[in-house]
C-alpha cells in the first residue's frame, strides 16, 4: 500500500484554478521531486497534501488512513481525531524554517514529540541529540535560532520534522531562502536521508539535486502533471514539449548566471 496517495485533486482560489486534477502516489522508501515553473501549482499541491489547504475535489490518503474522500464532486474531510492521526504520519519542512525564536535548538526539536505525542522527555531528548549530531549540529543544542546560519536553521527544521518519526517527509523549496553557499549543506542532509530510504516528496528548483537524489521526477505546470518518470527519462529524454521548454529555459538561465 502506498504511503501517500492524492487522486484528482482540484483547487481554485476564486476564478483561478490552481490544481486541475492532480494525482500522485508515493511508495515506501521512494524519493519524488516535483519541479516546474513558479505559479505552476507545486506549493499548492504540497499544501493540500499536508492539510494546510483543503482541496475542492479529490481524495487524499496516508496508508489506510483517509484524510479526504469525494462525494458529489466535492472533497469531504475526515473528522478532527482522524485528521490528527493523519498529521502524525507526515512531516513538513518549510522554505523559511519556522523555528520558535525563543526556544533553544533542543527545545525546538523536542517540543512537539513531548507536547503532542506525549512521549517521555528523556527519551525524546536523547533521540534529538542523535538527530542533531546527524544534521552536523553537535554542540548547538543550547543555541537559539538567531545564533545560527540559515543553513543551520534549516537543518534544525529537518531534525524537528524527523523527531516526530513521520512515515513521509515533505520539503517545500528547502533551499530557496538560503545563500547559495549554504545550500549544499542542506542538500547533503537530504541526500543522506534518501540513502537511508526515507520516503520524501521534495518541491525544488535545484535540478541537478533532483536528478541525483530522486527515484522519480514529476513536472507540474499549469496545475497538471505534464510528465513524470525516472530522472534519466525526464532530464535526458523528455517526451512533452512543455517539459523540454522548461528544462531548456532552466539551462539557459543557469548558463547566464555561471
Kindly give the residue locations of the regions a language model identified.
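Conserved ABC transporter NBD signature motif
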Residues: 58-72
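Conserved ABC ATPase signature
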Residues: 144-148, 152
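A short, proline-enriched helix->beta-strand linker immediately N-terminal to the Walker B motif
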Residues: 163-167
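Short coil-to-helix segment of the ABC ATPase nucleotide-binding domain corresponding to the Q-loop/switch region
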Residues: 103-111
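Catalytic Walker B motif of ABC-type/P-loop ATPase nucleotide-binding domains
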Residues: 169-172
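ABC ATPase "signature
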Residues: 228-229
